[in-house]
Each structure stands twice: as C-alpha cells, then as structure tokens.
Amino acid sequence: MKSIFVSGSPRESVGKKDAKALRVKGLVPCVLYGGDEQIHFFANEKDFKPLLFTPETHTVELEISGKKYNAILQDVQYHAINDRLLHVDFLHVDESKPLVIAIPVTVSGIAPGVREGGKLIIKVRKMKIRALLSQLPDNINVDISKLEIGQSVKVEQLQALHPDLALLDAPNVAVVSVTATRASRQAAQDEGKK
C-alpha cells in the first residue's frame, strides 16, 4: 500500500482560539491517537491534498519534531460553507497488530453480459478488511470477464481469492453484478416469440 509523508510540528496550546489562528496561516490542527499518548500537532494544509482528494487509500508516514509514526487517516472535519480543512485525526498503527481499513474495489475485464446488453453495477466501492500493515493491498481487484446477465461476484468469492485478508463485509453481499436492461429483456422476449 502506498504511503504519503506529512510533516508536522507540535502544538504548544490546544484550544479554539489557537486552532483558528493556525487555520488563518494555512495550517491544520491535527491529533495522533492510539499510541502511548495523544500527540497534538499542526501541518500545512497543502500536504493533505494527495491524501484526501483521491479514491485510493493510503497509509501516512508522520514526522513530528523528528520522530516518525505510521498512521492511517481516522477522521477529517471540513468547514460547512467553504469546505476548508478544519481538523484531521490520525490513528497510530502498530506494525505487529492487524488493523481495519476500507480498501477500494477495482474492476478488470469486460463482462460478456454487458456485451449482450446488460448493465454492469458496482455495488460496493470500498470493502473493509483486517490485515497487517505490511499485507495491505492498494485495492481489491474483481475480474468480471466471465459475468453473464443475472450473475454477480460476492464477497465470499473474493475471500477465496484473498485468503491472507479478512474481508469484513457480509459474505453474501454482491460486490459487482450484471443486470438485464429493459432493452435486453425486450430483445429476449422478441427472440422467444419467433
């Protein structure tokens, strides 16, 4: 899994007035949870663009006053009107313990059912998984090259393909399916009448 580097500096004082002063300077107040202690720090707002404005999931390598921490993005707060970053929470990740994270689902191949007039529906865009930091994939790929109209790929089928990951979504949930469109149903009825 890709990692993004964010450099921060510790905050001396924590409070509404100080957080507002940081935001005026283009800095974002942040907190790192999950380690031995909570670390309050601030970072440049521009450092968060590759982390937030992407469909991909990344781990974060934080450097706060010379110390490095592995983390994941826990929560982001935006301003209600102008959509500027207000606050970012990070969760410290221990490399020896499994973590739960949402991984994007990608689709590869062309479904024969789509060529016959069906419609491809991606029902799950991100799947929750549990794995060690070193085993996290960039995405979960779904091969749809054998999907006919009315067929789907379920979580339990993907779990069989990825035995090293624990997929936390319900096993009977359809991730990707090909459904019949009105035009394809009409064509099938017309062919049946002949």
Regions found by a protein language model. Give the residues of each.
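Acidic, negatively charged sequence tracts
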Residues: 1-194
